[in-house]
Design a protein with these regions (language model features):
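Internal alpha-solenoid helical repeat scaffolds
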Residues: 117, 142, 203-204, 293, ...
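Extended alpha-helical scaffolding segments used for macromolecular assembly and cargo binding
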Residues: 207-208, 219-227, 243-332, 336, ...
Length: 821
């Protein structure tokens, strides 16, 4: 990576930077860095030092920090030295204070022994213990100032003083070496050939550049020029008169091409210039095409600044904001959108801005109100751009559903019914089906939010089926379909669609979408009873959500983790995750509350379970999804708490829902609830027949447990043992400790000596979440490099985890992993 020319205070130019991430998505570049470091460490350990990391451009910083977070067994150590503002979340930090006065005095005595005592004391005071300042401030003083015979320079902040010190050394250079130094400062990437070509066109030579090197201001190594310190570069650039600066950038524009040419042309343009702005816009579009959103955003912003037309400038600012969102820079996108909003007047640009601003607010964890904003922005463009209007409505529906704003969901459904047909009419053949399905699904979601499950569910089922038959081309549409699949209990469809989207996201480096798809993967794994795999998926999704600033997604992931902990009876973990979910969007908060209710139910705290679940289903913080998914637990808690009348409504809701979605496991659970309120066993028997069709092993085991309890109370002890044994085996496989305890107690009550808790640990339980992911992929036949690419790790880390996993699993070779697929 190269140092960025930008310094504090906006005093340096908008010049090209050699961005490590310019050619690809920042996370894929980070993976490439990790792989490179891993390969370098194959023969011996590597120490990677980054001094002044705060001077790195954002793309380079992202890639390096991404790699650092994933270091494990590579034999690589990375150390960043930076100011506090450097964002290195997830890495251990060691704050460094300035040198104490005694150490500072010793350093000055060694390096600047001729300083008068008052001068030395002032330097110690003004340096604030900064070693760079202690070394450079004396070098900027003339002999009179060093001895105290001349008045000292005016006091400045440390950075300003050091910058001034370097500036004084720049000023001492003759004119042509100073010009050559300025060209190197403006060039920004350190390419010697480019610097020399531009310098030559201005009358400077390689010898002039050598003179700057002899002055200790830069180094020339091979074909590369490097400044002694970023502040030297800033000083050299800032000391250029305006006319020189414009000439330097003009010369550099002639000596370069692509993005750098466009940026140098921009820096050489003191006034708006449409030709230059258009050049920048073309470069930005090319950057978007090669998945470099950060670069594209910067180029679009520069293009906006140089646009003579306000409308063109606004359009380019909107593109800059959109690219910032794509690159995961939420705060930057919000700031750009605010600037664009000051000048946007037409409905189309305002609608595009609405998408950016709503996305930014949602990613910040504040979705409330964004749905109305999106829907309001869709209405004015419905006639002129129904496709964009429908996209806004899809986003609005998702945000409203997450925020628990049922009224907005219904409003969006009404708008979708009006706009959908027009949107279909503007599509080519293939997209028409996708658009029609999505519009219908929005209508269906609105009906469900209004309580009309029977007519809403078929519309949702249609969009899921359409997506499975012919995967949608739009990323927004693909992600939208995942929610209906889960809502309908179509676990196989949800798993299939989410796995395909996750694979596509890994292949294309769409890291921002991965937390969403991995969340759905985890939910389907929980439904299938694969808690270990779900925990590993959640760990990866959580890390990616944090890296991309998706606060709301972290809350949703926490709700799933709370559910797993509830099933397993881990109260501390469940409460921790439920609390995190409670701080997120309404949907996550409600799911976290349902997990707490399940925890209480499993631990036999029926009154508390009833209170928590009743609040989730009908309290002020209710959510439509919780009304359905809490019903079975609420009914069971009510019956056990001696309040069967409070189970009636829950049973009715669940029965209606199960009939609509027509999934065997859901119908079985509805029958189980009905059985709790019925004197006979017909409902239990019917439920067991439906469970035979598969799906949701935890729910089947719960039905078996309740059926066994009923049979035992009916004095049919021998009959009771069959479902109770099956329930116990399932609960033990799931790690559902409190539920297994109940099944064991019921078996003992039938007169059977129930087996003690199996002490036999599943070998997979010995693995860490990451080891489990790697073992599963290796068992499926993936190579180490394939696994590394999928999980954004180095292949050496994959090798290390497999090496650690083999003895834990009791295997000696990769071939033996097949049984763990």
């Amino acid at each position: 990576p190269r140092n960025s020319p930008a310094s504090r205070g906006g005093t340096t130019p908008h010049t090209p930077r050699n961005r490590l991430g310019d050619g690809s998505d920042r996370f894929l570049v980070g993976l490439a860095v990790l792989t490179l470091l891993s390969d370098l460490a194959a023969d011996r350990p590597v120490l990677f030092l980054v001094d002044d990391a705060h001077w790195l451009d954002p793309a380079s910083a992202d890639a390096l920090v991404f790699a650092a977070r994933r270091l494990g067994a590579e034999g690589v150590a990375m150390v960043f030295a930076a100011r506090e503002e450097f964002d290195a979340r997830g890495l251990p930090e060691l704050p460094l204070d300035g040198l104490e006065d005694g150490a500072a005095a010793a350093l000055l005595a060694e390096r600047a022994s001729d300083l008068a005592v008052p001068v030395r004391n002032r330097i110690i005071e003004e340096s604030a213990g900064n070693p760079l300042a202690l070394l450079e401030l004396p070098a900027a003083l003339d002999p009179g100032e060093r001895t105290g015979k001349a008045p000292p320079p005016a006091a400045l902040p440390v950075t300003g003083r050091v910058l001034a010190a370097f500036g004084a050394r720049v000023e001492r250079l003759p004119e042509r070496p100073r010009l050559a130094l300025a060209v190197a400062a403006a060039e920004g990437t350190g390419e010697l050939g480019t610097v020399l070509r531009a310098a030559h066109s201005l009358g400077a030579t390689a010898g002039d550049l050598d003179a700057a090197a002899r002055a200790g201001l830069l180094r020339i190594t091979g074909a590369h020029v490097a400044f002694r310190h970023p502040l030297v570069r800033a000083a050299a650039y800032q000391r250029m008169p305006l006319t020189t600066r414009l000439s330097v950038h003009t010369a550099l524009a002639e000596a370069t091409d692509g993005d750098r040419r466009a940026l140098h042309r921009a820096a050489a343009s003191p006034a708006p210039d449409e030709d230059v702005a258009a050049d920048l816009e073309r470069a930005a579009a090319a950057a978007r095409g090669r998945s470099a959103p950060a670069t594209a955003s910067s180029l679009y912003e520069h293009a906006a600044r140089l646009s003579p037309s306000r409308d063109d400038g606004t359009r380019r600012l909107i593109r800059a904001a959109q690219s910032a969102i794509t690159g995961g820079r939420t705060e930057r996108a919000a700031a750009l959108a605010e600037r664009a909003a000051e000048h946007a007047r037409d409905a189309g640009p305002l609608a595009e801005l609405a998408m950016v601003r709503a996305t930014a607010e949602f990613e910040r964890g504040a979705p409330a109100g964004t749905a109305r904003y999106l829907a309001d922005s869709a209405v004015p463009i419905a006639a002129t751009d129904p496709g964009l209007a429908l996209t806004l409505l899809v986003m609005a529906a998702g945000n409203a559903w997450s925020a628990g704003e049922d009224g907005e969901v219904r409003r969006v459904a009404g708008l979708a019914a009006e706009i959908g047909a027009a949107a279909v009419g503007t599509c080519v053949t293939r997209a028409a089906g996708e658009t029609a399905s999505v519009a219908a699904a929005l209508v269906g979601l609105g009906r469900i939010a209004a309580g009309d499950v029977a007519s809403g569910v078929p519309l949702l089922r249609g969009v899921v089926a359409a997506s499975r038959t012919d995967p949608f081309g739009s990323l927004i549409a693909r992600l939208f379909v995942l929610a209906p699949a889960l809502l309908l209990g179509e676990d196989e469809a949800a798993a299939e669609l989410a796995a395909a989207d996750a694979a596509l996201g890994r292949q294309r480096g769409l890291i921002g979408a991965l937390p969403t798809t991995l969340q759905v993967v985890a939910q389907t794994q929980v439904a299938a009873g694969l808690h270990r795999d779900a925990a590993a998926t959640l760990a990866e999704a959580g890390e990616l959500a944090r890296e991309t600033g998706q606060r709301h997604r972290e809350g949703r992931l926490a709700a799933i983790a709370a559910r797993i902990a509830a099933v397993e009876g881990d109260e501390g973990r469940c409460r921790e995750h439920a609390a995190a979910a409670g701080r997120s969007v309404a949907e996550a908060a409600a799911a976290g509350a349902c997990a707490l209710g399940l925890l209480h139910l499993g631990l036999g705290r029926h009154d508390e379970a009833l209170r928590v679940l009743d609040e989730a289903a009908s309290g002020p913080a209710r959510h439509t999804a919780a009304v359905v998914f809490a019903s079975a637990d609420l009914a069971e808690a009510a019956v056990h708490a001696g309040a069967p009348h409070r189970a009636e409504a829950a049973c009715e809701r669940l029965t209606e829902w199960a009939a609509a979605i027509d999934r065997p496991w859901a119908s079985a659970v509805a029958l189980r609830c009905r059985a709790l309120l019925s004197p006979g066993e017909e409902a239990f028997a019917a439920a067991m027949r439906l469970h035979e069709q598969g799906g949701r092993p935890f729910e089947r085991a719960r039905t078996e447990l309740l059926y066994g309890e009923w049979l035992r109370r009916a004095r049919r002890r021998s009959d009771a043992r069959v479902p109770l044994r099956s329930a116990l085996a399932a609960f033990e496989r799931l790690g559902a400790v409190p539920w297994a305890g109940r099944a064991r107690a019921e078996l003992r009550a039938t007169g059977e000596t129930a087996p003690a808790p199996s002490g036999g640990e599943d070998p997979l339980d010995r693995l860490t979440p990451q080891e489990l992911q790697i073992v599963r992929l290796a068992a499926s036949g993936a190579s180490n490099r394939d696994i590394a690419a999928q999980l954004f790790l180095s292949h050496r880390t994959v090798e290390y985890h497999l090496y650690k996993a083999y003895p834990k699993l009791g295997v000696a070779s990769r071939a033996e992993l097949a049984r763990f697929a």
